[in-house]
Amino acid sequence: MKVYLIYVLAAVAEIAGCFSFWAWLKLGKTGWILLPGMVALAAFAWLLTLVATEAAGRAYAAYGGIYIAASLFWLWGVEGHAPDRWDIAGGVVCLAGTAIILFGPRG
């Protein structure tokens, strides 16, 4: 369960950090919004190093599904746009892929 918590925290940090650039460049927010955004992006990178795996690529691949699901929650909770059925179906498929990567037998 610890790995899921790390991935969820990493996703929130990455999305918040990237959104700071979106807010600055597309929504006309002040450039100062980039400071907490860059801290969030650094936290995201650090959090992924806490995943117990021998290969960075595997950690990143498994994280991808969590990121997608978290992005859909961000879409709904922060931006006020409800995900449609295709968003939800895609998120479920990605989470299934994450589970396969995390829990599949290793040879």
Curated annotation (Swiss-Prot):
InterPro entries: UPF0060. It is found in: Cell inner membrane. It is a multi-pass membrane protein. Its main location: membrane. Disulfide bonds: none annotated. The chain crosses the membrane at residues 5-25, 32-52, 59-79, 85-105. Pfam families: UPF0060. One of its GO terms (cellular component) is plasma membrane. Keywords: Cell inner membrane, Cell membrane, Membrane, Transmembrane, Transmembrane helix. It comes from the Bacteria. PANTHER family: UPF0060 MEMBRANE PROTEIN YNFA (PTHR36116:SF1). Belongs to the UPF0060 family. HAMAP family: UPF0060. NCBIfam families: PRK02237.1. This is UPF0060 membrane protein Atu1058.
